[in-house]
């Protein structure tokens, strides 16, 4: 029986098929946007994945993302997965004490800080000594930047495979009714959910379309 595709399988397949087509469009202010093709997205993710692997974290290590939705949020998550690690997603509006709790409770080995509206009130929740990387559009920080890292790092080679049961995402609840809870999602789970969402969208936009959502 054929093995079902997982999220990274689809990513590499789309890179090969639609490499020069725009994948992500990021508003950058002033009515301007930056487009990223499939090739560009995967190349940046591979470079950051190589950087993460160079840190010698344990397999499946938790790497946190504190950011609003953005093109580089997606690239960072792909890099986390390519490096053999697990995403810890933190709501971008969480208070400092909750940020601190999630980072410590999850055992996060690293943090990506991205576009945020309340960083000044959150940054005290970042544990001293935790390695951090600033994504493009992040608030001003002392952290090394995404761009600096990918400019000096060679991309991770090959079509990286993850197991269906590997933990893809540890998604913490908002904590509005108590201590945030970490909900575990495997690669099998997140892929099948994404396939279901795509199937629903295709009912409205068709299977063969240039429409981007």
Region spans (language model):
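A short N-terminal helical cap/helix-turn-helix that marks the beginning
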Residues: 2-25
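Conserved pre-ATP/AMP-binding loop-to-beta segment of ANL
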Residues: 19-22, 153-172, 179, 204-213
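Conserved AMP-binding/adenylate-forming core of the ANL superfamily
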Residues: 24-70, 74, 78, 95-100, ...
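ANL superfamily adenylate-forming
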Residues: 30, 110, 117-164
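Conserved AMP-binding A3 loop
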Residues: 35-39, 168-195
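Conserved structural elements of the adenylate-forming
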Residues: 45-47, 164, 183-205
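Short beta-strand->loop structural element characteristic of the AMP-binding/adenylate-forming
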Residues: 64-66, 73, 77, 81-112, ...
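Conserved ATP-dependent adenylate/AMP-binding module captured primarily in the ANL superfamily
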Residues: 92-123, 152, 193-213
């Amino acid at each position: 029986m054929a093995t079902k595709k997982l999220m990274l399988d689809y990513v590499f397949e789309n890179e090969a098929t639609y490499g020069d087509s725009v994948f992500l469009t990021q508003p950058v202010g002033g009515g301007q946007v930056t487009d990223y093709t499939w090739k560009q997205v995967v190349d940046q993710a591979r470079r950051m994945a190589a950087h993460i692997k160079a840190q010698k974290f344990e397999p499946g290590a938790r790497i946190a993302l504190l950011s609003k939705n953005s093109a580089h949020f997606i690239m960072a998550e792909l890099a986390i997965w390519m490096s053999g690690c697990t995403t810890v997603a933190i709501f971008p509006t969480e208070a400092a004490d909750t940020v601190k709790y999630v980072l410590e409770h999850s055992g996060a080995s690293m943090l990506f800080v991205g576009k945020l509206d309340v960083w000044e009130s959150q940054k005290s929740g970042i544990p001293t000594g935790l390695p951090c990387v600033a994504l493009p559009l992040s608030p001003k920080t002392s952290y090394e930047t995404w761009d600096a890292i990918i400019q000096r790092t060679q991309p991770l080679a090959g079509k990286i495979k993850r197991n269906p049961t590997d933990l893809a995402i540890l998604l913490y609840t908002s904590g509005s009714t108590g201590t945030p809870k970490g909900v575990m999602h495997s690669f099998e789970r997140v892929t099948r959910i994404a396939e279901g969402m795509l199937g629903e969208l295709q009912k409205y936009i068709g299977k063969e379309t240039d429409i981007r959502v």
